[in-house]
Amino acid sequence: NYINENITPSDIQLNYDEETNIISPDEIDLKYNTSEVVDEAYNYTKTDSYFENIKRFFDLNKNIKNLEIKSLYNENKLSEKIQSISESINVAMENAKVYISDSGNISASSATIGKELDIAATKESIYDAIKNKDYKAIDLKVNIKQPKINTEAAKSVNTLLAEFSTKFSTNDSNRVTNIVLSAKATSDVLLMPGEEFSYNNLTGKRTKSNGYKDAPVIINGKLEQDVGGGVCQVSSTLFNSVLYSGLDVTSRRNHSLKSSYVSIGRDAMVSDGGSDFRFKNPYSHPVYIKNTVSNGVITSKIYGNASDKKNISIKVEPYTTGGLDAAKTYIENRDSNGNVIRTQYISNS
């Protein structure tokens, strides 16, 4: 009776953040083999052998015989109970998101901090409690997942930093298709502080299997038909918007022929497996890239925080080298009075 009264399973109390969950012994068929141990102890010196019984009796006077009380429970029921508790605790992590309509309306969703019960650690704590018959409350281990983009960062995008547009003919349907595809692939991108934008990474391979079509492209100083013709107009439009917004250009090359849609020094050539247009966000706030294509016009807009808005002009110095037209491209930062306070070299063309 003493054993049964003092070695009985109790409720297992699991605490987390002011919430308490209880697992009762009946829910997991938890019990201890006390009856078997009592029977074993009672019969220890009652074997069929008289001499063995005498030996065991005298051995007990010298050494204590330890009999193990074992726990018995239904592992499947325990797992199901812990899974049920985890579902009441777990919260999926969600990044805050920025939404900007084609007309320029800005909104943002809130971030959600993720929570996930450490099931393995919870089971180990319960196993220890049962084994040691120590039913003090267990503090659950819950892993916290912080969102990469928090609410404050998303809501800091509150104004248009810069925009640039170029025109194109709608007569070549293949070229229009390529423009629309690449503009969409590089649009609605939130670029966090220090993060780099890669045009090629976002569009992926510009192949027919990805929807791109044959259209005129500049290859070795000549216009030829090739898959993806027109995507460079999108990258060039974006390049100019990037310059006006003060972002850091990290990779840009010009075409071998002067482009029809931007002046010399203002284009950005891209090619699969080759030239890429890349830039970084130098600000402490995120920026958001938004491209639109409508009625023969590509517009690239870059949004960010009002404190990062700059008064920038683009300066191009044309020159001739080897009988070919070339140019040096600069951006000029101006103060509120329009005076140039800083000139930054971008690249040669």
Report residues per predicted region.
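A generic beta-sheet turn/junction motif
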Residues: 7, 16, 293-295
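Charged, low-complexity, helix-prone segments enriched in Lys/Glu/Asp/Gln
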Residues: 3-5, 9, 37-42, 156, ...
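Well-ordered beta-sheet/strand-loop patches within structured domains
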Residues: 84, 92, 99-101, 113, ...
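Structured segments of extracytoplasmic/periplasmic soluble domains
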Residues: 2-6, 44, 61, 76, ...
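Short N-terminal secondary-structure initiator segments
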Residues: 1-3, 35-56, 142-167
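Signal peptide-directed extracytoplasmic domains
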Residues: 9-75, 79-114
